[in-house]
């Protein structure tokens, strides 16, 4: 039989750890690169683009399509790093939490 008070303390501890992990993610910055660094995108932990840097060699009308592709790739690279870090942070917040049999988290 699971002690309800112990479970409640664990849940409160997990909630605090998850809140801390979310705050860390909100303050984190991720840099995605494409074209060997010709395009860089810096995104926040919330997935918002903060800055885009484009090498001047790509600022030619005939390079427009390639530039668009590189921006997309750089953004996706930054987002992937953000997603991986988010997953690791939340996994760490849940570490050590034992749930009663049959209890499932809402995610």
Swiss-Prot record:
It comes from Rickettsia felis (strain ATCC VR-1525 / URRWXCal2). Keywords: Cytoplasm, DNA-binding. NCBIfam families: DNA_YbaB_EbfC (TIGR00103). SUPFAM superfamilies: YbaB-like. It is found in: Cytoplasm, Nucleoid. The keyword Oxidoreductase does not apply. Homodimer. This is Nucleoid-associated protein RF_1365. GO terms for molecular function: DNA binding. It holds the Pfam family YbaB_DNA_bd. InterPro entries: YbaB-like_sf, YbaB/EbfC. HAMAP family: DNA_YbaB_EbfC. Binds to DNA and alters its conformation. May be involved in regulation of gene expression, nucleoid organization and DNA protection. Belongs to the YbaB/EbfC family. GO terms for cellular component: bacterial nucleoid; cytosol. Its main location: cytoplasm.
